[in-house]
C-alpha cells in the first residue's frame, strides 16, 4: 500500500513540474501534448513501481471493501464465542432462528464444529446432564419425616376446645372409677386349686368342731393350741367357743362341789362373773362363725374378700 501511494505522489509531482517548465509561447500547443505526456509518464511510472513491488513480494493496495470487513469480523466473533440456546425454548428457537442467507450458515457450521474442541477442562453442557427421577425410598423417607397434612374436611371437623376438655374430664372420671375395682380384682385373684371356703380362709364345720373339743377338753392349753395352729376363721371361732364352754363347766363344778366350799363362802358374785364371761365367749364364737359362713356363700364371686377375725 505504501509503494502504490508513493508512486501516485511521484507521478503527480512530475506532471506538475513538466507543466511549470513549459515556456509560455508553447503554452497552448504544449498543453495538450504535455497533458498527454504527463499522463503517459505517470502510467508508466506506476506500472514500473507495481512490477517492482511484485518482485519484492508486495501486493498492490486495493480499496477496502466494507462488506468484506463486516463478514470477516462476524466470522471471527462467531468462531470465538459459542451461541447457547435455552432448553425449554429449543423447539421454538430452532424454527424461528434460522439463517436468512447463505453467508450466515457457514459461520454457524464452523462454530458448531469448533465448539467441542474449545477446552477439554471445561464443564459439560447442561443438556448432557440427566436428571434422575425420585425413587420410592426417597418418597417414603420424605413422607416419614414430613407427614402429609390431613384434608380440609378432617381439619374442619375437629372438636372445639370446650368439647375436648369435656371428653378429657369424662375419660379421667371413668379411669378413676375403674381403678378401685381393678385393684380389688388384682388383690383377690381366684385360684382354681382351692374351693371358695378355702379361698376366703373361712374353713369348714370339721375344723370348727375339732378346735371346739380341743379347747373344751384341754381347757386353756387346748385353747392356745387350737387358736395358734389353725389359720382359718372356723378353727379360731371353734377354739373361742370351746374355751367359753369349758369356763362354764369349771364354774359349775366349783359351785356345786363339796371340795371347794371354803373358797366361795359369802362370795357368790365372783362365780357369776365367770359364768357370764363363759357364756359370752361361747355365743360369740358360735354366732360369728355362722354369720361368716352364710356371708361367704351369699357373696358374688367378683366381690369376695378374705376375712381375718383376730381377737
Curated annotation (Swiss-Prot):
What does the entry state regarding organ or tissue expression? Answer: Ubiquitously expressed, with highest levels in brain, liver, kidney and testis.
Membrane spanning residue stretches: 207-227, 233-253, 263-283
Residue interval(s) of motif PPxY motif 1: 123-126
What positions carry the motif PPxY motif 3? Answer: 159-161
- Region Interaction with NEDD4, annotated ranges: 123-126
Q: Known post-translational modifications?
A: Ubiquitinated by NEDD4 and NEDD4L; which does not affect turnover. Also ubiquitinated by ITCH. Undergoes transient tyrosine-phosphorylation following EGF stimulation, most probably catalyzed by SRC. Phosphorylation on Tyr-126, Tyr-146 and Tyr-152 are dependent on the phosphorylation on Tyr-142. Also phosphorylated by LYN and FYN.
Q: Which parts of this chain are annotated as the region Disordered?
A: 1-133
Q: Where found, per UniProt?
A: Endosome membrane; Golgi apparatus membrane; Endosome, Multivesicular body membrane
The residue ranges for the Extracellular side of the membrane come to: 228-232, 284-311
The name on file for this protein is NEDD4 family-interacting protein 2
Residue list for modification Phosphotyrosine: 126, 142, 146, 152
- List all Gly residues biased stretches: 26-37
Q: Which InterPro entries match?
A: NEDD4/Bsd2
- Organism for this UniProt entry: Mus musculus
Q: Where is this motif: PPxY motif 2?
A: 149-152
Assembly notes? Forms heterodimers with NDFIP1. Interacts with HECT domain-containing E3 ubiquitin-protein ligases, including NEDD4. Interacts with NEDD4L. When phosphorylated at Tyr-142, interacts with SRC and LYN SH2 domain. May thus act as a scaffold that recruits SRC to NDFIP1, enhancing NDFIP1 phosphorylation. Interacts with SLC11A2/DMT1. May interact with phosphorylated EGFR. Interacts with KCNH2.
Q: What is the protein's major site of localization?
A: membrane
Topology versus the membrane? Multi-pass membrane protein
GO terms of biological process kind: metal ion transport; vacuolar transport
Biased composition of type Basic and acidic residues is found at 48-75
Amino acid at each position: 500500500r505504501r509503494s502504490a501511494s508513493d508512486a501516485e505522489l511521484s507521478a503527480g509531482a512530475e506532471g506538475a513540474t513538466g507543466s511549470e517548465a513549459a515556456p509560455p509561447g508553447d503554452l497552448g500547443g504544449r498543453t495538450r501534448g504535455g497533458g498527454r505526456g504527463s499522463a503517459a509518464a505517470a502510467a508508466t511510472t506506476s506500472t514500473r513501481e507495481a512490477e517492482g513491488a511484485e518482485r519484492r513480494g508486495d501486493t498492490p493496495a486495493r480499496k477496502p471493501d466494507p462488506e468484506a470487513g463486516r463478514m470477516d469480523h462476524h466470522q471471527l466473533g462467531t468462531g470465538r464465542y459459542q451461541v447457547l440456546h435455552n432448553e425449554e425454548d429449543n423447539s421454538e428457537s430452532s424454527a424461528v432462528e434460522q439463517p436468512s442467507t447463505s453467508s450466515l450458515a457457514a459461520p454457524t457450521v464452523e462454530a458448531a464444529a469448533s465448539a467441542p474442541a474449545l477446552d477439554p477442562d471445561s464443564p459439560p453442557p447442561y443438556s448432557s446432564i440427566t436428571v434422575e427421577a425420585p425413587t420410592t425410598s426417597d418418597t417414603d423417607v420424605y413422607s416419614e419425616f414430613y407427614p402429609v397434612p390431613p384434608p380440609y374436611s378432617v381439619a374442619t371437623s375437629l372438636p372445639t376446645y370446650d368439647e375436648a376438655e369435656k371428653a378429657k374430664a369424662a375419660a379421667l372420671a371413668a379411669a378413676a372409677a375403674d381403678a378401685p375395682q381393678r385393684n380389688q380384682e388384682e388383690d383377690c385373684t381366684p385360684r382354681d386349686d382351692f374351693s371358695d371356703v378355702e379361698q376366703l380362709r373361712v374353713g369348714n364345720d370339721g375344723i370348727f368342731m375339732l378346735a371346739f373339743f380341743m379347747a373344751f377338753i384341754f381347757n386353756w392349753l387346748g385353747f392356745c393350741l387350737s387358736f395358734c395352729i389353725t389359720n382359718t376363721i372356723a378353727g379360731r371361732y371353734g377354739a373361742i367357743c370351746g374355751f367359753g364352754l369349758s369356763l362354764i363347766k369349771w364354774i359349775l363344778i366349783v359351785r356345786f362341789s363339796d371340795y371347794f366350799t371354803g373358797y366361795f363362802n359369802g362370795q357368790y358374785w365372783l362365780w357369776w362373773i365367770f359364768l357370764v364371761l363363759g357364756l359370752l365367749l361361747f355365743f360369740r364364737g358360735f354366732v360369728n362363725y355362722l354369720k361368716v359362713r352364710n356371708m361367704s356363700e351369699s357373696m358374688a364371686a367378683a366381690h369376695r374378700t378374705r376375712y381375718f377375725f383376730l381377737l
